[in-house]
């Protein structure tokens, strides 16, 4: 189970896995050797698996699922489940009900409405809200038991991922000769030990892996979590609604596009990120002011940003993080220059890696552009493993010019963002070459190459004309990449 080392630089070892807690894992370990880094990785994956077996709401065999099937019985539970239920009690009180595992009752009403393609009835929503408000369990600290009191569906999301990441990071640091660790699961990140990590905050309006971030943070011994409504939701009669609901009203929480929270305690970061997405700016500001060491950035529906007083202190000085009090005026579209890439357009490349039902290492992937003469123009993405296996990406590696520019680096860094599904990635091309200059309009080849260490190989290649007319191509899947969509369109 688990990934093998991807990058080794200055005694920092990097691992990637897919399908970890329903999303993707990035792990960085500062260790004295490959062997010690491997041990730290094994400790992280073991701790994640152990706690998932206790807390998962999606595994019918988990301790939580088995407890949820009981009614009115004082059931002895593990330390992790007891602590998690207790934390939910605390956060439900702190947020005046904005954070509640029983929100699943409301979410199911909206899911059913989306399937039927009609708005949910007010009576149905009111009934769901009423079931949320009742008590769902009682805890006995002396006996260490939990009694399930209601039949309301419960899902332990929100801060639970951060809770597990916290313990996984501690497990890595407990390994001999490991001095630092960064654990990033689905955009929730914990940085511990000697490492200082550069973290990009995804823009909810342009959330491709290589899109320009909203902010560039430098964190040490801290956690950051992001919640947002831009990757999932409900579509009803042509209208999109947030998958994040306010359990107090039964309505989708669509006032906040993205909420990013920094705190030393990962649980606080995770709980507040979700809560702020529900509560809105004013209520969030009030709650944050009652807690020390919490910084945040909210992106509101109109695009304006709300930031805590200390947010910019954690940002890289190279980034302009000026807070917008109101939405910026729309920029005029660039005037196309004859014979040059139309700057009003961009290329989206949407990949879905082949899905497995267990954690599996991410394959080597290179995505690059060639001109009509097959001359390499730009490497858009490079997901490395051990450098000696880069030759497995034989077509990309053959282009010496591209290799010399990108070898030894992973072109996508650590990102905090709303959780995405495992193996699903989007990257963009802005029509510029590796030197940052716009290319000529015309015909190019989009190349996607994937290889697994000691495993299978896949090459995808699509010719496309980039002259200002939107177009889409769907590439057939294969052993490593299940599907790929290439979309040339006006930039959003």
Task: Give the residues covered by each predicted segment.
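A short, polar/charged loop-to-alpha-helix boundary motif
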Residues: 265-270, 387-395
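Surface-exposed coil/turn segments at beta-strand junctions on protein surfaces, enriched
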Residues: 340-342, 420-422, 439-441
